[in-house]
Amino acid sequence: MPAGVGTKLFFSRNPNPRLAVAVARHLGARLTFEFASPFAPGQAERFRPLNPNLSLPILAWPGGSLWEADAIACRLSRDMGSDFWRGGEDEPDMIRWLSWGKENFARACDMVHFERGTKQRYGLGPIDHQLVEEGLKLFQATAAILETTLVGRQWLVGNSVSYADFRMATFLPFNDVAGLPLSDYPALARWYRRLEAVEAWRDPFKGLAAPHLPPVPRQEAMR
């Protein structure tokens, strides 16, 4: 599946689709972007053949498709001949961080963001404060590990930004509503500031037709 004519990345502004758009723009991938809402009335028929889960992101091309942000990042990096998805000796290290992050740091961020952000955006019920506390405890434990790792180094793998950094930070662009105490971890906070200096990460939707997410009522976000 060479990225090129007829290749589309279907996305929304939610965390994992945002991640995929940031990857594609960072790599300069040859594709077009299309905002999508597979769960909207009348849309399931169109998107189910591309992804039976109906979740975004979806990379589609004539005759095929690929879903899940990690798989899409791997595919696009290979297509563009980039080491953004690390290969060779660095690949196990990168996969280690992807695996650990998914089950630990990113999971902690997701737990808190879902309660304070996603549920409140879409009216899915009150904040479950027990789950928030569990998420914050996991955040503190895993942020401490990243803090130790990032002292004296700029990126998680090697000497340049990689997909491991993008993936680890999946939920941090939404920290205005999640309220995770990132500043308590100076090396981790510096790492994220470096990531925000990468234009594709900081503003992946620049120039794209992409409706904003519903706002989170401010009185609910931290209640």
Segments from the language model and where they lie:
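A broad structural signal for alpha-helix termini and local helix breaks/kinks
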Residues: 27, 51, 80, 150, ...
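Acidic/histidine-enriched, glycine/proline-rich intrinsically disordered or flexible terminal extensions
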Residues: 208-223
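GST-like fold's C-terminal all-alpha helical module
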Residues: 101-197
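Residue-level recognition of oxygen-bearing side chains
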Residues: 71, 187, 200
